[in-house]
Amino acid sequence: MAEKDKYRPLANFPSTAWGCSFASFSSSNSDFELYTREVETLKEKVRPMVTASTKDPLENVQIINLLYRLGVSYHFENEITDQLNHIFEIIPNHIISDDNDYDLYTVAILFQILRQYGHKVPCDVFNKFKNSDGKFKKSIANDLKGLLSLYEASFLSVHGENILDEAIAFTRPLLESFADQSSPHLAKYIRNSLLRPHHQGIQRVEARQYISFYEEDESRNETLLKFAKLDFNRLQLLHKQELASLSRYKKYIAQIIIWEDLNLAKELPYIRDRLVETYLWAIGAHFEPQYALSRAIIAKYTTIVSAVDDTYDAYGTLDELQRFTNAFQRCDIDAIDELPDYMKVLYRALLNFFDQIEDEVDEGRSYSTSVAKEAFKELVRSYYVEAQWFSDGYVPSFDEYMRNGLITSTYTVLPAASFIGMENTVGEKEYKWVQSNPKIVKAAKIICRLMDDITTHEDEQKRGHCASSIECYMKEYGVSEKKAIEEIQKICANAWKDMNEECMKKPPTVSRTLLKYYVNLARVIDFVYKNLDSYTYASSLKGDITTVFLELLPV
């Protein structure tokens, strides 16, 4: 065996920031039921606010915006859809006309909420805030509320909407200046928005931040605030129960999936032990109670996929990786004898995962586990391609790298498995749609692959790794690292526009729930990989995990 085939690119990843913190958590069903009763009581008080007919549709939109930002709009999806369908019929032409007296904040909120729910309000609505020379009017430069709303709304742009790109460039420096001069409370809110606009943030994290901000608003609606707090605490309790169950590797709380005792971190000390972070990934995909099974699948499967990724990237020799790749193409327990002992743990975990899922799927849905298995076979083949590239010192073209990299993004394998827990949303038609690699699915993979590369490539190159998209771009186009990153960030921005475009397509190809799922996957990546590899250096997520999973809101 050649010496290069025996090389181990050890990473020495940081240990878990949580240990067994969540395993000891326990609560009775009565706690959750008590919260649920209180939430249901307040929900009936809030419902008339959503369904009320008003002379000015702005009042309805402002309530919907509040519900959305406070994280409770999921309770009223049908009512909100009906309201916005009606508003969209009457609003666009009115707000485009020059004779309306809507200010910047009003226009931006109408634009943002309608687009958020799939209605493509034309970007021309912002022309009234420009001078004849095409520049934004100086008169709006002191309107903090309007500037923030314009900034947030601009991230719902699609291709060709230059005015929204200009709006981001116009508002950002002004908002940075406001942040420097504002009270600590307001400055924090502005800086959170500048770091990550609401449209690109994880919904639970965004809701927690906004509840704290709204609590300081003198014009706050006390009923809405209490409703949001109680519902946040209710969901936190549910999520904490799920996480505790996962942490103990015992029977899943809904008694649907049973996991054997399997401590991957103990058996495979070189991997990143990130169960808590993978569960954050799961609630980022969907936090609502009805998706408990899908969350369990995402968290457990991501833990296993992460261990396989670390094996290919940071431990396995080329010979061992080839054996593992070949073994999983058979997907048979008999192939385990061909593997070194440490790989047998991973291989057995994978087969157990698929066996347990297969036992639980409803009759007529066996195709779902077949799709998940085939996706994983493709993933390990692509992981092995990267290992070969590194071993051979080969730097592919950017396009060749991306063809393989969209697969190693894991945004094919993770949805394929998590859909098993979404049977009311994802059927055979939806699986076929996903396999056709539509624009929104490809965009989520692009964002995942490239944002990951931007923050991880330096560490990976130091320890030994195949060229990332950054190195491939630098070599192909003869540019600096800084320039390559700038161009790749533009590709990510365009991918977001692709996602927005797909979400506003009429009629929609698939349900809004499924479209939102892919937007949420992109949001998770932005949260985890913006400016830092927070999956590897997970202590950076500790504050957000604490507020989302551990700290109850005082009511």
Curated annotation (Swiss-Prot):
Keyword Lyase (UniProt): yes
SUPFAM superfamilies found in the cross-reference section: Terpenoid cyclases/Protein prenyltransferases, Terpenoid synthases
Cofactor-binding details, from the entry: Binds 3 Mg(2+) ions per subunit.
Binding site for Mg(2+) 2: 309, 313
Cofactor(s) named in the record: Mg(2+)
Enzyme Commission (EC) number: 4.2.3.-
InterPro entries xrefs: Isoprenoid_synthase_dom_sf, Terpene_cyclase-like_1_C, Terpene_cyclase_plant_C1, Terpene_synth_N, Terpene_synth_N_sf, Terpene_synthase-like, Terpene_synthase_metal-bd, Terpenoid_cyclase/PrenylTrfase
Annotated residues for binding of Mg(2+) 3: 460
Keyword terms of this UniProt record: Lyase, Magnesium, Metal-binding
Residues in the signal sequence: none
Top-level EC class: lyase
GO biological process: diterpenoid biosynthetic process; hydrocarbon biosynthetic process
Pfam families: Terpene_synth, Terpene_synth_C
UniProt: Mg(2+) 1 binding residues: 309, 313
Keyword Magnesium: yes
Short sequence motif named DDXXD motif, residue ranges: 309-313
Single GO MF annotation: magnesium ion binding
Family named by the database record: Belongs to the terpene synthase family.
Domain remark from Swiss-Prot or TrEMBL: The Asp-Asp-Xaa-Xaa-Asp/Glu (DDXXD/E) motif is important for the catalytic activity, presumably through binding to Mg(2+).
Function of the molecule: Probable sesquiterpene synthase.
Note: Does not produce any detectable product when tested in vitro.
Protein name: Probable terpene synthase 6
Gene source species: Ricinus communis
